[in-house]
């Protein structure tokens, strides 16, 4: 009888543990859902304010300000969300650092192929002594 009650308690404990885990992880908590809703509202407000700021001057934005004052107070009351909020900044698709990493030899190859007068150079075996001042090849010497 002792072994049966022990297994009964173990299965009961595992069942309660699974229910508690599902309740904590799967079921949304009202505080989390309200913080998500607040985050969505803040994002919409930020988009609206950026559109209004782009279309009108700062003085006009101050006239429109009282209609947004109640939303401004809500930002201070925001609960802790799941992560740090990243500001929306317009960035180029290719990072600026990539320009430093990419090595475009177009300017160098053009400088090697043509001289100051636009004449084509046909080789670099002899160095600069191979060409005269006008870009023509020297033979001999």
UniProtKB/Swiss-Prot annotation:
Signal peptide: 1-31
Residue(s) carrying Phenylalanine amide: 82, 122, 139
GO cellular component: extracellular region
Cited PROSITE patterns: GASTRIN (PS00259)
GO biological process: adult feeding behavior; adult locomotory behavior; inter-male aggressive behavior; larval locomotory behavior; multicellular organismal response to stress; neuromuscular junction development; neuropeptide signaling pathway; positive regulation of cytosolic calcium ion concentration
GO molecular function: neuropeptide hormone activity; neuropeptide receptor binding
Residue ranges of the TM segments: none
Domain of life: Eukaryota
Disulfide bond residue pairs: none
KW Secreted (keyword) present: yes
Keyword Membrane among UniProt keywords: no
Residue numbers bearing the Sulfotyrosine modification: 117, 134
Main location: secreted
Propeptide: 32-73, 86-111
Localization per Swiss-Prot or TrEMBL: Secreted
Keywords, ordered alphabetically: Amidation, Cleavage on pair of basic residues, Hormone, Neuropeptide, Secreted, Signal, Sulfation
Function, in words: Drosulfakinin-0 (DSK 0) plays diverse biological roles including regulating gut muscle contraction in adults but not in larvae.
Family to which this protein belongs: Belongs to the gastrin/cholecystokinin family.
Protein name: Drosulfakinins
Protein source organism: Drosophila simulans (Fruit fly)
